[in-house]
Amino acid sequence: ENIFNNHMNHMTDVGTKGLDLYCWESNEQWRFVNSARPTGKMNQAIIISNMQPKEKEYMLYLPLYDGLVSLAIGVDSLATIDQPLIDYPICKKPVVFYGTSILQGGCASRPGMAHTNIISRRLNRECINLGFSGNALLDLEVAKVISEVDASVFVLDFVPNASVEQMKERMETFYRIIRSKHPDIPIIFIED
């Protein structure tokens, strides 16, 4: 069940409030399986059927914009859902992204196609997506939260949201808050 059942005229409903399922293949890549396409506030979908009776690893992407009140996953009566057997994506030392609606996944056709999710699959590394639609304004409280993450790299993409004045006032302090706790970790700035 979706929280708001929002519809955006510039983005697909699958991207806004749908689900994407990926499967880990023997060639060590995540492969798209199917999407749950929303039809309203309450939805029911069969994403995959007629599966071979063997264990596989799956990754489910949640909606990019609309939240979920609840999510129930049904499986065949003989099937089980267990903890992953593989550590993919690798959760240790994630990539942390901070930025705009574009970073959040704005206008991606489906959840798995948000660029941070594509990067996560390609690198097999967890990506923490702190994309705030219209609100990447270099709030120093956000920098403090970001600095608490033991990341492999920080990617800062705030230019489309922050004004020149906000950047002059806050950018260096925002950077220094993160840098003070992570003196040797790369911090990448994305320009407009």
What label would you give each PLM region?
Residues 27-30, 89-95, 126-130, 161, ...:
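Short C-terminal domain-edge/linker segments immediately following a structured domain
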Residues 7, 104-107, 162-165:
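A generic structural signal for short coil/turn motifs at secondary-structure boundaries
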Residues 1-94:
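N-terminal secretory targeting modules
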Residues 132-192:
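Alpha-helical cap/lid subdomain in secreted, periplasmic
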Residues 2, 98-99, 156-159:
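Short loop/turn segments at strand-loop or loop-helix junctions that form parts
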